[in-house]
Structure formats: structure tokens, C-alpha cells
Amino acid sequence: ANYNVPDGSYSTDPYQPATRVKEFKQMVQALHRAGIRVIMDMVYNHTFNTVESNFERTVPGYFYRQKEDGTLANGSGCGNETASERPMMRKFMIESVLYWIKEYHIDGFRFDLMGVHDIETMNEIRKAVNKVDPTICIYGEGWAADTPQYPADSLAMKGNVSHMPGIAVFSDELRDGLCGPVWKKEKGAFLAGVPGAEMSVKFGIVGAIEHPQVRCDSVNYSQKPWAEQPTQMISYVSCHDGLCLVDRLKASMPGATPEQLVRLDKLAQTVVFTSQGIPFIYAGEEVMRDKQGVGNSYKSPDAVNAIDWRRKTTNGDVFMYYKRLIDLRKSHPAFRMGDAEKVRKHLEFLPVEGQNLIAFRLKDHANGDSWEDIIVAFNSRMTPARLEVPVGKYTVVCKDGVIDVRGLGTQIG
């Protein structure tokens, strides 16, 4: 593996080394012109080959962690794990990230199995990046595939993210609170109308921070808040690992009609985009991407992995809903306060009767929002629900899978 060169198979001529570099830069430039920032997936935690790797051939035994018996540690689940805590591996990672920023103008980095790396290295990367551009995004998977050969309290795991300011991790609490356990695809949760996941969803709504109305003893994977700030949590329901959203809904609700799948798809992403963390969408979800039930599709053909863009027409309603969700979040800072104290002050969960119903209020022009009070309610029941809200006249902007900021009518509280 060469971490500092684009892969040639994506270029128009893989046999001309300069072509991949030029075309990658042209791609980044074109995306920037379109107002899109570019985030790279960085897999420093392991290499495909150990003995023949550049690391091992440079200094044998140095760049990889070993067990006490001398065999390779395997926290990555891929045969080895790199030793990020060792000075030269740490130096390599920092300089590699800076190279991609300065040479290719990359805007962010997603660290694969970040839990294999040590906290100090991740913090040093954040500090080095801040000197160039503090707006560059750094986030990763706050877990490992197996147990790394390094003290758990020193690893960049989800539970240690409070020690990594400016670094975010994925929230599997919110994901599985909505969709069900990732390893039990037939088992649903909030979206499927299964009671008991409400607190896990609330945990995600506030951005995994401490909040007086979130009881962590009822949250699926975390018994305490792990984020100091809501910007340290990635809100999502699906990514390239595991089933895409449509396949997950079909697996947990095999009797669902196409119309129900559309409504649940919209409901899921509405939770994501009105939560205080950083929203994340898997490519193609906006057109209801379907991978034919294949979860781990890294070795599947294009017939499974390709995005069928004809779905943009057949599922145009869903596409426009996603677009309007994004516009809604961008237009209203109440949904992205970015500060834990503001969230605790302005986000208030409303009392509801029964389960499979969650409602909250963003009050008092939260984060300088033009709207004084915003009421958000999620109902995954098969029937309408009654909700008591503070006295007032409210303009409805999102209802029954339709968004229109001009208003869909009014309600009196």
C-alpha cells in the first residue's frame, strides 16, 4: 500500500503515473467549484500484506503491534494492526494527512477503525490540521474489529472521544435505536414500531452529550454520554458497512408495502437531519438505493454496488424530500447548535403517552434561529398520535412525508 498516491485504476490511464495525480486534482477542483468539500477515507490501521509491506521492509517489526508471543496483533480483523503510538508511525500518519491537505486540497478525513489508533496520535493529527485549516473535518469509527494490543483507555474508541476535542465518531446508538441491532437484520427497533428504543434515539438527537432528560441507563450501547460537544457525534442510519437503509427496512419488516418503506425512509432521515450531531448519508440513499440485501458488499459486482440513477426518477419524491431536509437544516441553526450548553438550554423533550412516539421543542430562538419555537415529533406507530404542545399558533412545515417551509397549514397548541 502507498498511502500518499491516488489509486490508478480509477484514472483514464493507469499505466501513466502522472495521470492519476492530475485527474484526482481535477476532480477535487471540480467538486470545490460545485460547493462540495471532499472527505477521504483513511485506512492507516492495517495493511493488506505484512511481510511485503513498505512498513515492514523499512524497519521489520516496528510499524506493527505484536502480541506477547511475538505474533501479529489483529485489532483490525485483517491480519495485522499498525502501531500508531510509535514515533515514526505517528509521524507518518501526521505527515500523510498534511500532504493530502496541501497537495490535493482535501477537506476532511474519515478514519477507518479509528479505535485501533491511540488517542495521542489522533489529537496530534487534529492539532497539525488546525494549523493549516481548523474547518477540516476529522471523524472515524470509534471501535475496532477485534481487541487491539494496546491499553483500552488510551485508544481512540467511542467511549474516549471526550479526550479528543474536534474529532467525531459514528453513533451506533442512534443507528440501531432506529433500525435495530446491526448484526440481527431481522430485528427492528423504533422505525419498525418496536417499543423500547426511544431513549437511544433521544441520546442521538442531543448529540451523545449529557442532557437532563436523557437517561443513559436505557440507551442501547452506552451507559453514559461520551461526547463533550454534539459536533463529536455522527448521526446516521446506514453506511457502506451493513445493509443500506431500504434493505434494512425490508429485512426487519418483510411485510412492509412500498408506500410504508418510503414513509419510514423519510422518517429515518428526518431524525438524522434534525439531530444535533453531524448528519451523514450513505451515497444513493436519497434515491432509495437497494443492494439486494447484501450487507458486506466490498467483494460484490457492480450489479450490487452501482447506484441505479433511474431511481432518481422513480423515487423523485424521496430525492426531493432529502433535498428539502438538507435545506431545512442549513436554513435553521436551531438544528445545529454545535454547543452542548446551548443544546441543554434550548432542546426540551415533550411528554408523550405510550411508546414509539418522540417529541422535542427547540425553544427561544435556539442558536439565533428566526423561528421562536420549533416542535419536532416522530411517530412510528401505525396510527396517528395526540401530542400536547406549549400554547401558541404553529405553522406546519413537515408532515406526512412532505416538507414546505412556506407552510402546510397551522396548528393551535
Predicted regions and their residues:
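Short, solvent-exposed turn/loop segments enriched in Gly/Ser/Thr/Pro and often Arg
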Residues: 1, 42-51, 113-118, 141-145, ...
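Conserved, mostly hydrophobic/aromatic
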Residues: 3, 31, 41, 100, ...
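Non-transmembrane alpha-helical segments in soluble domains
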Residues: 28, 97-101, 126, 130, ...
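Active-site rim elements
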Residues: 84, 110-113, 223, 249-262, ...
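Conserved alpha/beta catalytic core and glycan-binding cleft of carbohydrate-active enzymes
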Residues: 126-127, 135-288, 298, 364-369, ...
